[in-house]
Amino acid sequence: MKFKSTKRFGPITTGHRQWRDRGHCSFIHGYGRYVRLTFEASELDERGWVMDFGDLKDVKGWIEDEWDHRTLIADDDPLIPQLKELEEMGGIDLNILPEGYYPGIEESCRYLYDMINPMIKEKTNNRVEITRVEIWETEKNQAEYVR
């Protein structure tokens, strides 16, 4: 039997640009993103919990450091030189994602999983892992990454 619990963070005001899009998503735009992480364990801890939500301050801080009022772009965005110039002038707080990740919510789910799941496994001695990451950019638009 598996036990699951979820934790939701947000809204986290985040901008991004999807330069490969042929439409308006190629422009810098943003949303108040909500993130929901699903934790899974075969055994509960000594308190009967899957995850101690009070022990997620570092996870919340990491997400906020990466996303809050920042603009996410892919590492192969052709406007990187101009965006870096704008950042130097104080007009943007740029976050160039690692190679292979893109700023849309689908890839953002995978990025969070890849970055945060090792943190969770370490803090729980491999007892807990993330099995689902969901992100909402609006009430109507949501994506998820499922392990």
Feature locations, PLM:
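Charge-rich, low-complexity N-terminal segments
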Residues: 1-147
